[in-house]
């Protein structure tokens, strides 16, 4: 009957709204956990380096998010998820204006927050490789370029449905390539450019140990990152499927 059909449609609509709300809550939870990786990186790097570098490292990790997130919101997000130009870069759109199919049924603000913390993670990976060897202003320049250009464009190749790597069947799960390989490769390039730490080698070229100043803080950073990395594939699996 028409009455029964109306009841069924209302129930179906209610279920869809409920599941959509649960998806949103879950993604927000995942966003908070991934954001907390910044604390893990900061503790790890600070504890395993010399005390004189502690303030510099903490500020660099803080600026990775503060500066990086702004640039990602302003232009990087559209480079990553905007309509593809030849499979290499998204159509520029200031402040994530317009619709983005990648968000699916999620509110765009929620999806933007989720994408931003991934960008911050890729940027912060480099900090540890160059800890104690870069000037603060130089690092800020790197952070801006990485967040606004490098990560969004390479991510477009992999995560955008029209990206050139995606179109030939490349599959990235949990950011293994888009976040960790890109961040790790950039860290390697940075380490090669800045060279060894001052005092690392004696006059005969023999390497000398440079112990960290606080192993307790360093260990705390390891535990934070381990917890989040262990749970990361599960979170991404539930979000993706």
Regions found by a protein language model. Give the residues of each.
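Short, small-residue-biased leader/transition segments that mark boundaries at the very start
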Residues: 1-8, 232-235, 240-241
